[in-house]
Amino acid sequence: MKVKKIAAVLLAGAMVVGIAGCAKEKEEPIKIATKPMTEQYSLGEMLTQLIEEQTGYEVELTKGIGGGTSNIQPAMEKGEFDLYPEYTSSGWIMVLGHEAGEVSDEEMLSKLQEEYEKEFDMTWIGLYGFNNTYAVVTTKEAADQYQLETCSDLAKVSDQLVFGGNPDYIERADGFPGLSKAYGLNFKAVKDIDIGLKYEALKKGDIDVTNGYTTDAQISRDDVKVLKDDKNYQTNYYCSTVVRKDALEKYPKLEETLELMDGILTDEKMAELNYQVEEEGKDEAEVAKEFLLAEGLLKK
């Protein structure tokens, strides 16, 4: 009888330890952060859904960290987050302190991986495929009228057109001044336009050309046209996943799951997803799920 009691006590103790162990596991989900912008919310949802389905690990997603890179990177270093979507030139310039143009786009990923591993014990996994950089945008009507395909084409007729941009872009050296110098642009007039009103001003005909980003929601509709940066003036911002190395060790299936994001998005696809959220009012989680299902990356 005494032996049975001891065995029962040991069994109960083992169960308590087992339950505690399970509870501990649940308290340590993979922690993902995103910047405060629409496409980052959708990317965070994609990463979350892929990881949860492919690996079974629990994910804790924190959307919209104020300050973006400047606050997420220090939090990553402290272990407060395990991974987040980041842009190549943001890492190269803002985090590592390099200058734009020091390395080619082809070399960028391997250089980032090398320096992040050395400095932070982190790495970059895959490139999603899209490039969120500055874009020069005009209306389809103006593009047809003046036969505009590139920024060099724009330079030939810029003295007949009005440019409207947000004050920050118009003032910063690598924005409008640098673009104008690179292409010899000389607009009839330049107007300050609030960042949220640029496309509306373009649509109304108040301006003919504006600055945007290559994945802006409005670009997914065919009433506007992005002019090709044929002199490669703009710095490229390709998106990838920054992840702590210890997270890859702790969660064995994580790396191969993150690799599934490689090459799945183009500028046009990302702009379309942004449009669905911003203009059609869809939830980011729904948009992410529909996209991943269409790509064959989710089963349900």
Report the location of each language-model feature.
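Short, well-ordered beta-strand elements
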Residues: 25-39, 57-64, 159-165
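Ligand-binding pocket segment of bilobal, Venus flytrap-like solute-binding proteins
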Residues: 82, 159-230
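A conserved helix-loop-strand patch within extracytoplasmic ligand-binding domains
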Residues: 106-162, 245, 263-267
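Beta->alpha turn/N-cap motifs
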Residues: 65-68, 79-92, 108-109, 138-139, ...
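Short, polar/charged alpha-helical segment
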Residues: 38-58, 76, 81, 177, ...
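Ligand-binding "clamshell"
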Residues: 95-106, 110-125, 206, 218-232
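C-terminal motif of bacterial Sec signal peptides marking the signal peptidase cleavage site
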Residues: 17-21
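Short helix-initiation/N-cap motifs at beta->coil->alpha
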Residues: 38, 61-74, 91, 167, ...
